[in-house]
């Protein structure tokens, strides 16, 4: 599948009910899909998530009972588990701001207004609220 074909496919939404267990996602197509997950936007750009890709048949079988016994879990070639990150804190925000300054080629000081907005947002929430925010990002 070419990148253009992948984009066209992503624009067409469809819930697959039955997977062909004899087929797998080609490595170059999977690589493009992984890159699209990495590039997914989030609030503040913090991306408070982790993607876990499961291809092991035994692991997928073990997850079946936790997935309402939906056969798609065991029949798919690649299963992606989306995880919200718990415990977002000031260190994470500072790390993100340092990375942002580096990528944009600007000083960290030039991002102080943005930093203040982020700190105000997260400073007004407890851990439960921060986790709820992260879950909503996923």
Name these PLM-found stretches.
Residues 1-138:
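Acidic, surface-exposed loops and disordered segments
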């Amino acid at each position: 599948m070419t990148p253009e074909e992948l984009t066209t496919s992503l624009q067409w939404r469809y819930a697959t009910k039955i997977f062909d267990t004899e087929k797998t996602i080609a490595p170059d197509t999977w690589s493009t899909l992984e890159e699209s997950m990495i590039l997914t936007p989030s609030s503040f750009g913090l991306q408070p998530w982790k993607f876990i890709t499961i291809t092991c048949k035994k692991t997928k079988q073990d997850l079946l009972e936790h997935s309402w016994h939906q056969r798609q879990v065991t029949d798919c070639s690649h299963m992606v588990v989306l995880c919200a990150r718990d415990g977002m804190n000031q260190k994470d925000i500072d790390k993100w701001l340092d990375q942002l300054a580096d990528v944009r080629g600007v000083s960290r000081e030039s991002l102080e207004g943005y930093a203040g907005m982020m700190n105000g947002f997260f400073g007004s929430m407890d851990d439960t609220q921060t986790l709820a925010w992260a879950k909503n990002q996923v």
